[in-house]
């Protein structure tokens, strides 16, 4: 088991625990706790690690959990339970759960102590870390949200080991993202260790999760609130990926949409002359290596192009008709590029037809 702390803000450190018994950290929390957990989580697996007063609240999974009206229902739980700013909110579940629970923890009384316990690979390496919380509104994903850092991130690998391999694969797109634009060593590890990663070897999973968390937190530490143009690197694949999700009515798993989004955006970078020769091929190869989709033809749902382009035009990163995008220049490196939204829509239309 690996445990370390990162100082993201001057107010507090974030404890990070990765390993097969990471849940034991919860025994250190003696304060009153509201535990919001995915209905797919076996709560009996969690209870032995809980001490002191706590309230268990099963919640919805997936995009249903991220509806703004549902967030109001969860806030009422905190209000009715008499929770105050000295108490804790614990989110146990996938990315949609940590997104939603992080949002309510940050807004109730302007902030309660938050602990994220992601139970999927996607949650452990992306959605459950970094402090961005969001819910959906008006057909647009994550358009209402906050920046709010958790007190701790607990990545207990036993959750992953018990998941079907396909669920682990869905989260690998985000891991591969770090390798493509931030961390060549991680890319090389993934290239050489496919079998151990997909077979959920604990040592390989521990390395992949720890490395991904450190990659993301290093970016967040430098640009927590997206004011310096650094954190945008974490959006690689997400501009087109979110459009794909919207165009499918959010029926396509996030990881698969991001996988196709990374291929599209790597191609755009190449066509605009920002990436070295071979970057597109290396992107396609590593995603195919892990049996992730590389084109919309490989996705399970049809994409409504009009809806996808509408979502693209409503992207939060658009300023004065221009979108700031992270383009891979070589494996493990990237460049910030301003792309006119109409130009991007033209490229996206080619990619999504």
Swiss-Prot record:
Taxonomic classification, please? Archaea, Thermoproteota, Thermoprotei, Sulfolobales, Sulfolobaceae
Species in which this protein is naturally found? Sulfolobus acidocaldarius (strain ATCC 33909 / DSM 639 / JCM 8929 / NBRC 15157 / NCIMB 11770)
The subcellular localization recorded is: Cytoplasm
Please tell me where NAD(+) binds in this chain: 61-66, 119-120, 132, 141
Cofactor dependence: Co(2+); Zn(2+); NAD(+)
Q: How is the cofactor bound?
A: Binds 1 divalent metal cation per subunit. Can use either Co(2+) or Zn(2+).
Query: Taxonomically, which superkingdom?
Result: Archaea
Provide the binding site for Zn(2+): 174, 238, 254
What does the protein in this record do? Catalyzes the conversion of 3-deoxy-D-arabino-heptulosonate 7-phosphate (DAHP) to dehydroquinate (DHQ).
Q: Which leading EC class covers this enzyme?
A: lyase
Q: What Gene Ontology biological process does one annotation of this record name?
A: amino acid biosynthetic process
Q: Which family, according to UniProt?
A: Belongs to the sugar phosphate cyclases superfamily. Dehydroquinate synthase family.
Where mainly located?
A: cytoplasm
Pathway, per Swiss-Prot/TrEMBL?
Metabolic intermediate biosynthesis; chorismate biosynthesis; chorismate from D-erythrose 4-phosphate and phosphoenolpyruvate: step 2/7
Disulfide bonds, paired cysteine numbers: none
Gene (name only): aroB
Among InterPro entries, the record links this protein to: Dehydroquinate_synthase, DHQ_synth_AroB, DHQ_synth_fam, DHQS/DOIS_N, DHQS_C
What is this protein's record name? 3-dehydroquinate synthase
Query: PANTHER family, per this entry?
Result: 3-DEHYDROQUINATE SYNTHASE
